[in-house]
């Protein structure tokens, strides 16, 4: 089988930097899928992406589809011909569909009779004839939320397309994609190298772009270069570069030929909280801040230029000039904010609505204050500090700094609280109330901060559900899914003895008559328990394990987690499958019983040795495991219950549960009821597959 390397490049105007990597990887995945569906073998598909191009390269791509043998069975011979031996309409219709006459059909003899059959070999198409359609479909299926048209064209794409290049080995593929004729022209860097040049082979692409066009098309190569140079520059300044993955990807998406440089700002700006300065550098300017070995911000930053002059002085000074006004603004806002205490901003919260039916931010802080105190009392935190932090929790939203730099909410509250002389735990809680901000984020460290974070999240969940505005589909304007999962993480990972029903009920009471949903407690609890499923699935825990625990609806998250871990462990035991099946059988038997099923076992009615053995073991385990269940030691309990396997198997082999004698029948049902209740103290293991 002969192969060639295949290249496809789509040359565009500047692509959205935050979406570039996602578009490029999706393009490569789509091409892979299309090649597989076409039956074309290949070694691998590589992707390339720069601000003005998306490209893929399929290595070792077969030059043609393999031939396929087909066999289409038609009607039975007895039904294919009439009494005169002429083809029936059924036979003729089948033959027509196969592109043959009935006379050309072969015969297939089977043990069920003789059938008409059409056998043929379909030659595979040359790969080059398929490539335009493969790339067109791959582009059409990219995750682009908003398309655009350009010029007088009707075609749509994320940005205007100016060049399309498709090479299969050394052959330029003819055709048109997105309204652009395929050509051997590739565009270089906008300012460096050749603006346009031609290539004659798929394997020339990367080298020609670098040498002629001054473009490093390999996204990962540019990224690695930026990272290495940034770390090198930071080390030279005696510091460490703060390089977040998302920002690094975005910067990589903004440049075609990266030139990593450093610049500085006046040391006087270091009097402003570092978070505000970093917010400006990262968010607005896409700079990498530099910290010293003690974690203090240095008056230097790293930036990446898309041009590479011999003397970079003008570029460096230009970036310093651009960032200076933003840092000056931050300095002014900070100094102005310090003139008023956080507590004195409380009245202004009355002018800002949290939600029309739920009142103002001042109303919300009053509720957070009360609920944080309740939570603190339950988890052993300082109640007064939790209430104080709850009271001040939203005051920094009224400051100039947070109004201008919104992502500094919380952290500026902490700095202003420290300036006001508030207790350190109170100050830190003002920042940590928003944790975790995203999946995998760290949790509040102190119990005071946990109290405020939970109070804030439960207030939002209860309030929004309480007015009937639960999330629908992907819409979640109040970020209730994040609030629910964040709350669960705090309670589980901090092992806090909190009950969801209790917290929602207390939260709902603080709204007075504002809530209109009478089922708000159940709705919020069910919503939060539903978040567990996604969490545990991400950890690789089987869905049936989660469902087994959900069937019992435990409302204490830490307890829920302990049950899931126990059932997940139980599922690995040799006896698990048999006991799950036995529990399913028990459930089915008991479900058919009319009226209440007793749990009283009458030893005098135990006849068979097997039922005596099971009854005694169940009664013994009930006594033995009572403290184990009470302490939430579910794995220990299930390990002991696993010892029931042989006894249960013997019982079902030898004992007729639904005996004719009513007393025997009820007594045996009572044994099974007690058996099932033992397992139900952990989960419904009959759900396990």
From Swiss-Prot:
It catalyses: tRNA(Gly) + glycine + ATP = glycyl-tRNA(Gly) + AMP + diphosphate. Disulfide bonds: none annotated. It is found in: Cytoplasm. GO terms for cellular component: cytosol. SMART domains: DALR_1. One of its GO terms (biological process) is arginyl-tRNA aminoacylation. Its EC number is 6.1.1.14. The keyword Protein biosynthesis applies. SUPFAM superfamilies: HD-domain/PDEase-like. Its main location: cytoplasm. Keywords: Aminoacyl-tRNA synthetase, ATP-binding, Cytoplasm, Ligase, Nucleotide-binding, Protein biosynthesis. GO terms for molecular function: arginine-tRNA ligase activity; ATP binding; glycine-tRNA ligase activity. Transmembrane segments: none annotated. Tetramer of two alpha and two beta subunits. Belongs to the class-II aminoacyl-tRNA synthetase family. This is Glycine--tRNA ligase beta subunit. It comes from Actinobacillus pleuropneumoniae serotype 3 (strain JL03).
């Amino acid at each position: 089988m002969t192969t060639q390397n295949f290249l496809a490049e789509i040359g565009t105007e500047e692509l959205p930097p935050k979406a570039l990597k996602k578009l490029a990887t999706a393009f490569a995945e789509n091409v892979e899928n299309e090649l597989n569906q076409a039956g074309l073998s290949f070694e691998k598909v590589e992707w390339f992406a720069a601000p003005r191009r998306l490209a893929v390269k399929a290595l070792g791509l077969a030059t043609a589809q393999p031939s396929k043998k087909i066999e289409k069975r038609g009607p039975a011979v007895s039904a294919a011909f009439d009494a005169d031996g002429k083809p029936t309409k059924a036979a003729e219709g089948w033959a027509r569909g196969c592109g043959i006459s009935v006379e050309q059909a072969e015969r297939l003899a089977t043990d069920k009779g003789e059938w008409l059959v059409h056998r043929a070999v379909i030659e595979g198409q040359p790969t080059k004839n398929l490539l335009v359609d493969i790339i067109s479909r791959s582009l059409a299926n990219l995750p682009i939320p908003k398309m655009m048209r350009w010029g007088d064209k009707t075609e749509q794409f994320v940005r205007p397309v100016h060049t399309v290049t498709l090479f299969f080995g050394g052959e330029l593929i003819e055709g048109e994609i997105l309204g652009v004729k395929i050509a051997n022209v590739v565009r270089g860097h906008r300012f460096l190298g050749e603006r346009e040049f031609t290539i004659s082979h798929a394997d020339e692409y990367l080298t020609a772009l670098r040498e002629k066009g001054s473009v490093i098309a390999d996204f990962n190569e540019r990224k690695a270069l930026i990272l290495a140079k940034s770390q090198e520059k930071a080390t030279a300044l005696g510091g460490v570069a703060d390089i977040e993955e998302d920002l690094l990807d975005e910067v990589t998406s903004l440049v075609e030929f990266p030139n990593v440089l450093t610049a500085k700002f006046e040391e006087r700006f270091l009097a402003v909280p570092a978070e505000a300065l970093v917010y400006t550098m990262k968010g607005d300017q896409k700079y990498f801040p530099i910290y010293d070995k003690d974690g203090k911000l240095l008056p230097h930053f790293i930036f990446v230029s898309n041009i590479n002059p011999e003397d970079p002085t003008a570029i460096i000074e230009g970036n310093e000039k651009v960032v200076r006004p933003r840092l000056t603004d931050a300095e002014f806002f900070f100094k102005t904010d310090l003139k008023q205490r956080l507590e004195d901003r409380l009245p202004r919260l009355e002018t800002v609505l949290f939600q029309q039916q739920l009142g103002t931010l001042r109303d919300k802080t009053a509720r957070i204050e009360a609920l944080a105190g309740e939570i603190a009392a339950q988890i052993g935190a300082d109640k007064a500090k939790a209430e104080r932090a709850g009271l001040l929790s939203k005051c920094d939203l009224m400051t100039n700094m947070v109004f201008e730099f919104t992502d500094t909410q919380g952290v500026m509250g902490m700095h202003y609280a420290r300036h006001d002389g508030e207790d350190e735990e109170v100050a830190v809680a003002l920042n940590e109330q928003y944790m975790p901000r995203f999946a995998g984020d760290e949790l509040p460290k102190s119990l005071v901060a946990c109290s405020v974070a939970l109070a804030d999240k439960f207030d939002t969940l209860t309030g929004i559900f309480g007015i009937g505005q639960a999330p629908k589909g992907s819409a979640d304007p109040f970020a209730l899914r994040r609030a629910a999962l964040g709350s669960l993480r705090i309670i589980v990972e901090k092992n806090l003895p909190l009950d969801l029903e209790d917290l929602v009920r207390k939260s709902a009471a603080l709204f007075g008559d504002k809530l209109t949903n009478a089922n708000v407690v159940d709705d919020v609890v069910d919503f939060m328990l539903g978040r567990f499923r996604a969490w545990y699935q991400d950890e690789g825990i089987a869905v049936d394990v989660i469902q087994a625990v959900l069937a019992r609806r435990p409302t204490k998250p830490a307890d829920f987690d302990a049950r899931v871990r126990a059932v997940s462990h139980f599922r690995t035991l040799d006896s698990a499958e048999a006991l799950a099946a036995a529990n399913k059988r028990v459930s089915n038997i008991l479900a058919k019983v009319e009226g209440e099923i007793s749990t009283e076992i009458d030893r005098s009615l135990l006849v068979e040795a097997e039922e005596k053995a099971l009854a005694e073991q169940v009664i013994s385990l009930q006594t033995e495991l009572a403290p184990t269940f009470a302490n939430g030691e579910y794995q220990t309990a299930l390990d002991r219950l696993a010892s029931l396997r042989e006894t249960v198997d013997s019982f079902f082999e030898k004992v007729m549960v639904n005996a004719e004698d009513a007393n025997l029948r009820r007594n045996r049902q009572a044994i099974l009821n007690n058996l099932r209740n033992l397992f139900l103290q952990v989960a419904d293991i009959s759900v396990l597959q």
